[in-house]
Structure formats: structure tokens, C-alpha cells
């Protein structure tokens, strides 16, 4: 028996050594420390020798009666701390949870100007939350690619919310939010919201949200579908088109176009419904090509001082600019299209001043002379001039 047990122990020794050798790498791996961190640049990137005035938006804002705090990464929850008797307006279906005395909380469904907001495609169903004791609420959105941003309104600067669904929640007794109609943009982007007063705002954007701070004299060009909100300053944002390289080809004129336009056949053809339908189709194709192919050349120019909130993901050009605005910007010379408007206004002012100047000169005009005609007996007429100079 002793010999058998000795032989069994000798046969199991290789397995024991191999087992110890298998465990040794695991023990060595457990003793190693792996440290991973995100690299952060010390300074922002340079653009044409100047610092790009873009930074991340604020994650928290507070007032005497409330506090907004963005939680999570990438910013999936909004924590709202309310004092007693403070009202919180949040979009319907965005309330996640609430901590505090639930018996003191009152929640009602509020309709905020449903007629005007429905016409402008702005959400008008909001949940009004108030409590007689301090509470803390968590708010989120249904979309997984949105980012929160909080704005503190101190009453000195008003804001314009460019996106219809960007406003998520707000609080403040003196805060006023009024829908505004912007006819310069397309039907889907007619609705803007003007925010005035004091309070806190919670905005959401598609992708990541960034804040662009402009000083006096600085300019910033942004795509209109990327703009979430901006401060209301003068002058207002203007359409802008970048310059492009143009290769002009001069073809000698043979007068063929003028001859064809003067012919009766072309004149009669232009009055037919078929010709008008063809022109309308060509207009649609031209506008579509400008939106899809050259749509990256249509931007908005902001002049400082101003603060602009931009989002990393944007909508289509067709949802931002109307057909008329696309064609006007594309047909205008490169640069700021506001110059053409200023020239037209100046020309109109000159036309109004010319008749006024003529009317002013009428009372000052006086008779400088007088002519007297006399008929002689032979039928001849003689003129004698008399007046001031004689």
C-alpha cells in the first residue's frame, strides 16, 4: 500500500507543477495596475492665428429659489432642486423621479398658448410641478443623442431659442417665454421662442452642445440648422455665403437669343401652360441642387458681443431655409447679402428725397421777367421784355 501511494504521489507531481505554473501568470496579472485617463489639451486649438471661441456649455446654474444640475456622461439627467412654493415647468413625459415629501407636491398639466404654439410647431403641453416643501426632481428626454445645457437668466440679456423642441424645462416667477414667428426660414422652422425675465432654463440639443462667446467686433459664421439659441443683440443674424472660385468663359454673342425671343413662335410658346410647367419644374430642380449640392455655402453671420449655443448634429438644409431664401442667397454675390438690402433701402430713400426737394424749391421760385406783345397795323407782332433786370 505504501508503494502504491508513493507511486500515485509521484504520478500526480507533474500535474501539481503544471497547475502552479498555470496560476502564476494570473497572480502576476493581478498585481499589475492599469491607469486610463482622457487626454485634455491645455489650450484650445488655433484657427487662423486666433483662439476658437468655443467651449462646453455650463453644467449647473442656480438662483435663490432653484438649482439646475446636469448629471451623467454624456449628460443624460437633469437634477432640479426647488424651494418651497417654486413652480417648475417641464415638458410632458420627461419627469423621471422626485424626492421629498410626496404629499406636498402638486402636479398639473398646463396648456401654454396652444393655438399659437400649435401653428408654429412648438410644444405647448407642459407639466407644472410645485410643492410646499423643498423637493428635488430628475428630468430626462426620450432621445438618446441629446445633451443638456442650462442657462441662467439675470434679466440683463434676453435669449432667442431657434429650435422648436430645444426648450425642456424652466423655472422663475418673472420668466416670460413668448413664441415668435420667423418668416425668413422654412415652415418647419418658423417657430422661435423669445425668453425674457429672470430664472433658469434647461435646453436640449442633438449631439453635443457648445457655447460660442463673441466679443465686440468679432464675427462668427454658423450653419442655421446647428444654432440652438443665441442672445438677442443688434444687429440680428444675417445670411452669408462663402466666396467660390469662378472660371468665366466668354462666348461671342451672335444675337441668336434675341432673334428667338422676338419671334412670334417663342412668344406664343411662353404663354402656354406647358411652358410655364416646364419653368416651374426647372425652378424646383435648381433649388433642389442648391440645397443638396451647394447647401454647405449657406450660413448665418453673427456679430459680437453675443453668445451662441450650437449643436454638433444638425437637420437638413431643406428644413432650415425656404425656397425663396435659398435662391436669393445663391443668386446674390459672395459675401454678406445684407449689403444688397442696404443698397435697395438707400436707393428708396433717395427717390423719396428727390420729390421732397422739388417741392421745397417751388415756393422760392419767382418771376424774373415779363414780356409784352404789341400788334401793329400791318399784322406784325413785336415783343418787348420788361422785368426786374430792366
Swiss-Prot record:
UniProt cross-references to InterPro entries, sorted A to Z: AIM24 (IPR002838), AIM24_sf (IPR036983), Trp_RNA-bd_attenuator-like_dom (IPR016031)
SUPFAM superfamilies registered for this protein in UniProt: TRAP-like
Subcellular location: Mitochondrion
Entry's Gene Ontology cellular component terms: mitochondrial inner membrane
Residue interval of the organelle targeting sequence: 1-28
GO biological process, one term: inner mitochondrial membrane organization
Disordered: annotated span: 348-378
Keywords: Mitochondrion, Transit peptide
Basic and acidic residues bias locations: 348-362
Family to which the UniProt record says this protein belongs: Belongs to the AIM24 family.
Protein name: Altered inheritance of mitochondria protein 24, mitochondrial
Organism: Ajellomyces dermatitidis (strain ER-3 / ATCC MYA-2586) (Blastomyces dermatitidis)
Gene coding for it: aim24
